């Protein structure tokens, strides 16, 4: 991460002051000019600790098992995801299909040991799984980023991998990929699905 050169997210007043200060540097008769901004930017989580308004009860599988827990999480995050999409005017969800639920069901079909066919015949199983996982992770990340607290990327990543049922599904599908004879799935299990800090801690 390159930090926050223009201030914290969702702080337009601070960001404007930073930009005005930057533009004022062009008024110096000679340069280059190295000047400190007179204010300290608030650190993510400094004023408000992260208390996600949606609690997943440590992501323990519920009556519907892991699949039910993932789909329940998606439903609970839905209002936050929609808020994020309206604020930004766009979303990165959609490389697999039109909804996070569709991506989740594809991922979960592998967890259950009965993989669905790829939605696009041009995609290999590995490509479909990767796209579905990317969609699912983007949905969670965008939803939680819309919640109060100004979380940084590391906090969001830790929350996803340590506290959600979706992360448990990713770990399960990684095991499937590692044991698979499909050459498009094996690299996912070895390299692409799970960050090293998660697998090293297993």
Where do the language-model regions lie?
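Short, structured coil/loop segments at alpha-helix boundaries
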Residues: 8-16, 60-67, 159, 163-164, ...
């Amino acid at each position: 991460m390159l930090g926050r050169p223009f201030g914290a997210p969702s702080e337009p007043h601070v960001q404007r002051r930073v930009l005005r200060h930057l533009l004022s540097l062009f008024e110096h008769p000679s340069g280059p000019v190295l000047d400190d901004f007179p204010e300290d930017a608030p650190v993510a989580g400094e004023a408000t600790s992260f208390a996600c308004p949606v609690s997943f009860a440590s992501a323990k599988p519920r009556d519907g098992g892991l699949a039910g827990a993932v789909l329940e999480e998606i439903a609970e995050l839905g209002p936050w995801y929609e808020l994020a999409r309206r604020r930004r005017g766009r979303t990165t969800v959609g490389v697999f299909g039109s909804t996070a639920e569709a991506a989740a069901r594809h991922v979960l079909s592998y967890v259950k040991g009965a993989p669905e066919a790829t939605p696009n015949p041009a995609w290999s199983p590995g490509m479909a799984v990767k796209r579905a996982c990317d969609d699912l992770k983007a949905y969670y990340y965008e939803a939680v980023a819309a919640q109060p607290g100004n979380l940084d990327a590391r906090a969001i990543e830790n929350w996803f991998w340590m506290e959600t049922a979706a992360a448990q599904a990713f770990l399960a599908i990684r095991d499937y990929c590692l044991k698979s004879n499909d050459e498009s799935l094996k690299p996912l299990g070895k390299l692409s699905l799970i960050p090293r800090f998660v697998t090293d801690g297993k």
